[in-house]
UniProtKB/Swiss-Prot annotation:
Pfam families: Ribosomal_S2 (PF00318). HAMAP family: Ribosomal_uS2_B (MF_00291_B). The keyword Cytoplasm does not apply. This is Small ribosomal subunit protein uS2. Residues 230-255 are annotated as: Disordered. One of its GO terms (molecular function) is structural constituent of ribosome. It comes from Rhizobium johnstonii (strain DSM 114642 / LMG 32736 / 3841). One of its GO terms (cellular component) is cytosolic small ribosomal subunit. The keyword Ribosomal protein applies. Keywords: Ribonucleoprotein, Ribosomal protein. Gene3D superfamilies: Glucose-6-phosphate isomerase like protein, domain 1 (3.40.50.10490), Helix hairpin bin (1.10.287.610).
Length: 255
């Protein structure tokens, strides 16, 4: 295994270089702006390439030493991609809504996860002794908990690294990571504050193809870390070396 390859052309074809309207920018992003076109800021991909490569190395290194990566993206166009990419790389995710205290009040979150497990046991069994209405209420409670916590139910503690799409929307998650000293890898669009992020990646954080490309690369970097960890322990890598490729990557490579 090796870190995933990517090219400037793939970034261009995924629309990574398109920022927001110029009047919406954060002036702190000035060093990462190439220019503007039709009142849209153009992000300097010559800087994105090395910064993305650095972030991929950090993800791989974190997983290689047994660390956990938490994917965070709750906006509509990121939600499904975030979950799929985290699952494929045996990592964790929050893709519905960030609950305040999700990291800083882990004990309370752990209790909710225990409740989710208990509900699974009850409902996966015969659920004897419950009326139809009681069972329906339990199912609704489980569904609500699973939506909020399903992606972290097996995490076992706070993560060692967080990967975030849309730093403005996920500001609470970033604040909690900072308080706990958890490093953050994040996409920073032209309207973001790069100072908040340990490993920033300048790029569009709205286009589905761009989000799919980032998530695919981060996922494959995590899988590379798993392979390195297993290799160092002498275990057979088995099927983990076979990784499905996101359509965005395939299309970009073929284009």
């Amino acid at each position: 295994m090796a870190l995933p390859d990517f090219s400037m052309r793939q970034l261009l074809e995924a629309g990574v270089h398109f920022g927001h309207q110029t009047h919406r920018w954060n002036p702190k992003m000035k060093p990462y702006i190439f220019g503007d076109r039709n009142n849209i800021h153009i992000i300097d991909l010559a800087q994105t390439v090395p910064m993305l490569s650095r972030a991929l190395q950090v993800v791989s290194d974190t997983v290689a030493r047994g660390g956990r990566v938490l994917f965070v993206g709750t906006k509509r166009q990121a939600s499904e991609i975030i979950a799929d990419s985290a699952k494929r790389s045996a990592q964790y995710y929050v893709n519905s809504r960030w609950l305040g205290g999700m990291m800083t009040n882990w004990k309370t979150i752990s209790n909710s996860i225990q409740r989710l497990r208990k509900l699974d046991e009850i409902l996966n069994g015969e659920a004897q002794g419950f009326t139809k209405k009681e069972r329906l209420n339990l199912e609704r409670e489980r569904e609500k908990l699973d939506k909020a916590l399903g992606g972290i139910r097996d995490m076992g503690g706070t993560p060692d690294l967080m990967f975030i799409i849309d730093t403005n929307k996920e500001k609470i998650a970033i604040d909690e990571a900072k308080r706990l000293g958890i490093p953050v890898v994040a996409i920073i669009d032209s309207n973001c504050d790069p100072d908040l992020i340990d490993y920033p990646i300048p790029g569009n954080d709205d286009a589905s193809r761009a989000i799919a490309l980032y998530c695919e690369l981060i996922s494959r970097a995590a899988i590379d870390g798993i392979a390195r960890q297993q290799g160092s322990s002498g275990r057979d890598l088995g099927a983990s070396s076979e990784v499905p490729v996101e359509p965005a990557l395939e299309e970009a490579a073929e284009g």
